[in-house]
Amino acid sequence: MKPATQVLIERYQKHLYAIAFNICRNNQQDAEDVVQDTFIQYHTYKKEFDTEEHIRAWLIRVAINKAKNITRSFWHRNKCNLEEYMETLTFETPESETLFDTVMKLPEKYRIVLHLFYYEDYTTQEISDILHLSVNNVKTRLSRGRALLKETLKEEWNDDE
């Protein structure tokens, strides 16, 4: 099963961009490059996939790896400000904006797991498959990420008072 690349672009482009943007630490251009490179790799990939879910997991895994490679790259020096990207986003409440800002400041290993769990609706088993981690490791990262997020938000809200 290998659906047309255009169909998958329409279906997964925004999700892959969000993941790549998260890993690339707020750099729009790098995130766009990751998404484009991911779909190019899919288009040239010779093997067939069993299910749509297998394709989705493969795309996410490739995007994560490409984004990590970019952030490790020697040439990855200039980054866009969070403020530049924030101008393109709309939030329903000020709290949503604060939450997004705080999640973006978390260490990568927590940020990715939280994003996949809460924004992409993956189960812990699916996340463990995508990231090649044990289910217990995913649960631990979710728990520690939530605790760190809660602690950081408490500090920010106490500072506002």
Label every PLM stretch briefly.
Residues 37-54, 74-75:
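Sigma70-family region 2
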Residues 69, 76-103, 123, 161:
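Internal acidic/polar
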Residues 64, 68, 131-155:
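DNA-recognition helix of helix-turn-helix
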Residues 113-117:
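A short pre-motif secondary-structure segment
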Residues 48-50, 61-80, 144:
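Arg/Lys-rich amphipathic alpha helix in sigma70-family domain 2
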Residues 17, 39, 107, 111, ...:
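C-terminal flanking helix
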Residues 3-5, 81-83, 89, 130, ...:
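C-terminal edge and immediately downstream basic/flexible tail or linker adjoining helix-turn-helix-like DNA-binding
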Residues 1-18, 32, 43:
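A short, charge-rich alpha-helical start-of-domain segment used by transcription regulators
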